[in-house]
Structure formats: C-alpha cells, structure tokens
Amino acid sequence: MREVNSNTVIKEVEQIVEKACSRDTNVFGYNIWTHHITQVVKIGKKIAGRFNADPEIVEIAALLHDYAGIKDHSLHKEHHMHGAIEGGKILKDLNYPEQKIEAVKHCIRNHRGSVPGKRGTPEAECLASADAIAHIEYVPSLFYLAYAKFDMNIDDGTDWIRKKLNRTYKKINPELRYLIDEKYKSAINLVAKKEAQL
C-alpha cells in the first residue's frame, strides 16, 4: 500500500464534509460548516497540545464528528455511531492507515455530551471539549438551530438551548473550563428562566 499524505487526506475530508453541508438535504444549513465544524477544527487544533493529542487525528475527527447527521438527518439521534461508520468508510477509501482510522472513529463515537461514553484517549477528550467550547463560543448558532431550523417557539427554544449549554459545559475537560467560564455564564444568564425585572 502506498504512503498516504495526511494533508491530502485532510483536504479530501474537508471537501467531502463541506459539500455535504452545502446540500439542500442538510437540515442544519450551510451554517453548520461556517459556524460549527470549522470552529471545532480550529479549537481542536489549538487545544491538542494541552492533551498531548495527535493534532491530525483531532482535525480529521473534528471535520467528521457531525457528518452523519448532516448527510442524513434521520441519523442525527445516533450521529456519533453512524458518523464513526461513515468516517471510517471515507478514510478507508482515502487509504488512511487503519490504526488512525480507529482512533478517529473512537473520537467521533465519544464526542457527545448527551450520550455517556468513554473518551479514553487524548484525541477523544480534545474533540469532545472542542465541540463543547464551539457551542458556547458561538451561541447564536444554537439560537439559529432552535428558531430558524427547528421552528421552536420561544419557551421551547430557550429551554432547549439552556439544556444544550448545560450538557455542553459538563463535557468540557475540567482543566479547560476556565477558558470559557465567563462566556458560559453569560449565555446561561441569557436563557435563564426569570421574570422581567423592570
């Protein structure tokens, strides 16, 4: 088997995921690419060193972590499982090394805050934290999902966003929470249940 160039693999995966994000069938809209996936990649690469994580694995896993739900919304509820399968197929087709494929799949399977998992590797810890930090850093994308894409009413949307932020914060590695504490508190305050105070 010929030697695979990791930069080529990353570029190919990037193109595949961005193309899926641009399709009309993607219920999240192209904004999931511009306001979430690319942000998870950037954050993941920035924090990889803190975990002694392989930045290549983190970057590829970040690109693919929501791919299954983007490609087919019926897979969204279990997108972490389907995404690992889909990601594995993509990487195998690109002749990516099997050991690295398994590492990427492990990250994808264990990135969600709403589903118990065993991160167990620096790369999986990094992806889960990067995904969570991106949600808190870019709260407007959650409002967009709740109201524009999922057509929720004000109360349901606010409740969904609040629960999402709470789950998200809990999945950030405790050693990194200080990086996002103020933004998290501000976001939670914005969606807190409260009466008008004027």
What function would you assign to each model-found segment?
Residues 2-8, 26-52, 64, 115-198:
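Divalent metal-dependent phosphate-bond-processing catalytic cores, especially two-metal-ion Mg2+/Mn2+ enzymes
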Residues 3-23:
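Short alpha-helical hairpin
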Residues 8-13, 53-61:
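Short coil-to-beta-strand
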Residues 21-25, 48, 67-72, 91, ...:
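Short amphipathic alpha-helical interaction patches enriched in hydrophobic/aromatic residues
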Residues 40, 78-93:
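An active-site-proximal "capping" alpha-helix that borders the catalytic cofactor pocket
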Residues 55-74, 79-83, 103-113, 131:
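His-Asp-centered metal-binding catalytic motifs of divalent-metal-dependent phosphohydrolases/nucleases
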